[in-house]
Structure formats: structure tokens, C-alpha cells
Amino acid sequence: MHCSTWDYAKHLELASAVAERFKPMIFLHSSMQSDYSGSFSFLCFDAYESSSNSFHELNEQLNASKASDSDFFGLLSYELKHELEQLEKSSKGRIQLPKLLMHRYNIVMRFDHQLKTCTVFHRSVDDLNKIPKPNTSGPLQCTLAKLESNMTKSEYLQKVRDILEAIHRGDLYQANLT
């Protein structure tokens, strides 16, 4: 991997321009809202390798890696737990995601929000030409999607009561009701 410096100033606008041009892409934005969220954001695009089946496949790709390869970025779903332990299968949610979806990218940009710097990790010098110009014609316009729950208020409250009872019984110590 090569390493270059880049303009930090318009990182949100740059992420928007990348999203319009590259699929898949990942933007991990710390937004510096609190001490524990870290000081770095990452923008990754121009994928050259993917893994989407299992830990086994990902492990094989990692073992075949060269020092010049970038890291994998992506998602690990809760369903991957079945590759590690014999657990009861949960009901399918409304959003169908792969168990694992990881990509290696030709371009990984790291924004340091404390130092106000941007470091670009890229596989070739030509990759720098792929970085789009950020949209600077005006303020970045963001829209929110319509959010709705998959349960009624009474269903939610009943599930909270069920979780609290399980905690009091000692069946679990923590829950994330989503």
C-alpha cells in the first residue's frame, strides 16, 4: 500500500461524492461527539476483493494475503454466531443481510478529526485519480428515511417486561431489544 496526504476540509462532502460513484463503499464516521467514539473516520471505496460466506472463507483469504493488501472492512451479522456455537435459530428479520460481507478496497482514507489531517492508503499511484472532487456548490443536503417500528407500543412494553423478568431470574444479565 502507498500512503499520501489529502485535503481534510470537506470529508463529509467527499463521502457523499464517493457514495454517488462507487458501490460498495464504507464510511465509518466518528463525528467526534464524545471521548469514547474515537478521533478517526474511514472512507473506503473501489473494492477489489470480497468475502461473503463464512469465517472459513475469510480466513483463507487472510492467509493468502500479501503485505501490500488492504484490510477488510464490512459487516458481521448476528447469524454468524451459528458458525461458532450451537444456538437456537432466531426468527428472520425484515431486513435480509448476508451473514458476513467484507471487502478490501483500493482506496482507504483515514480522517483524523483531532489533527485535521487525511491520510490516503492506496494500492497504486493511479488510484489517487479515482478520488472524486467533493461537492462544494453548497451545504450538504441530508434527508432522513421514514423510520417505523416492527412492533406496537404494547408489544414493545410486553417484551420489556419479559426481559426484566428474565434478568431477575438470572437467565441473562443484559439485553438489546431491537
Where are the regions a protein language model picked out?
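Signature of the chorismate-utilizing enzyme
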Residues: 1-178
